[in-house]
Regions:
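Short alpha-helical segment that forms part of, or immediately flanks, the ligand-binding pocket
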Residues: 1, 156, 174-182, 202
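Active-site-proximal region of nucleotide-activated glycan assembly enzymes
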Residues: 4-70
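Conserved donor-binding/catalytic loop of nucleotide-activated donor transferases
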Residues: 6, 160-162, 178-187, 207
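Donor-nucleotide binding loops and adjacent catalytic segments primarily
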Residues: 70-74, 78-165, 198-201, 213-222
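Acidic donor-binding loop of glycosyltransferase active sites
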Residues: 149-152, 160-175, 182-183, 228
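A short, well-ordered alpha-helix in the C-terminal region of glycosyltransferases
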Residues: 236-250
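C-terminal alpha-helical cap of glycosyltransferases
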Residues: 249-273
Length: 273
């Protein structure tokens, strides 16, 4: 507010479909409000509409880098001939999602759930959960087509080989999934602030880029129903892939910086030029 009173431009960047309280309050005085989700615009004060830019969410996209699927699969311990389901529960992993997947694989190995033929799982457990997940898999006889890792340093490389993802619905995660055109099953974190992950997941499901499942109602059986539907329908996956890419803006950082530079005295050029 002090910056607005002093005539200093105020720029905000909102990453979620439901704008946070700070964004909703300060947007009244903002010169620019950059949003990642077009759905968030309707939740901002009417007076701020002219200053709103649907710019996307700044993420790290490697420039001029080619990803060879065969080589990357080999590097990750995956079979290049099988499609890849990527499961990631956030930077620290998710105990709830890990337990869900463990129980699903246990039922799969016993024959009570589909084996999802032609697919393999790359499971990012989180560092603190990796040992317990591996121990559980060992007790199941170390099922094939399941590869666990504690953490991924180079997520763009992994996203480039993922054919389907199971994930939380945080702003950065969903932005990366959209940028790489990865169809996804989104399971929002129930305790996220203002339930923003729920809003993100619902927005992406409405656009056709994802399937939204609630953790409280989820069982291994219901997760497998969605997995079977997707893994057996390449046409559906392709439509979701196109919908995801349509939602993405991998140049978001450049777009936002370009708009900010326009506010500087004596500058009116596009840094993208």
């Amino acid at each position: 507010i002090a910056t607005a009173m002093a005539g200093i431009p105020l720029v905000l960047q909102e990453q979620n479909a439901w704008p946070g309280a700070t964004t909703r309050f300060l947007s009244r005085w903002a010169t620019q409000v950059h949003v990642a989700f077009p759905e968030s615009v309707q939740h901002l004060p009417l007076l701020s509409k002219d200053s709103i830019h649907v710019s996307g969410c700044p993420i790290r996209i490697p420039q001029n880098q080619k990803y060879e699927r065969h080589d990357l699969c080999k590097k990750m311990g995956l079979d290049p001939g099988l499609k890849v389901i990527l499961m990631v529960g956030g930077s620290q992993g998710s105990l709830a999602l890990n337990d869900l997947m463990k129980n699903g694989i246990r039922s799969m190995t016993s024959g009570s759930l589909s084996r999802l033929e032609g697919w393999q799982l790359l499971w990012v457990t989180g560092t603190q959960h990796h040992t317990s997940v591996d121990q559980a898999l060992s007790e199941m006889g170390s099922p094939g087509r399941v590869r666990t890792v504690p953490y991924i340093e180079d997520m763009p490389s992994v996203l480039s080989i993922a054919d389907l993802a199971i994930s939380r619905a945080g702003a950065m995660t969903t932005a990366e999934l959209m940028a790489w055109g990865v169809p996804s099953i989104l399971i929002p974190l129930p305790t996220s602030a203002a339930n923003h992950q729920e809003m993100n997941a619902q927005a992406l499901q409405n656009s056709g880029a994802a399937i939204h499942l609630n953790q409280e109602e989820l069982t291994p059986e219901s997760l497998w129903i969605s997995l079977e539907e997707l893994t057996k329908d390449q046409g559906l996956l392709e439509r979701m892939r196109h919908a995801a890419r349509a939602r993405s803006n991998p140049e978001a950082a450049t777009v936002i910086v370009s708009e900010i530079i326009r506010l500087l005295p004596g500058f009116n050029q596009d840094v993208r030029a």
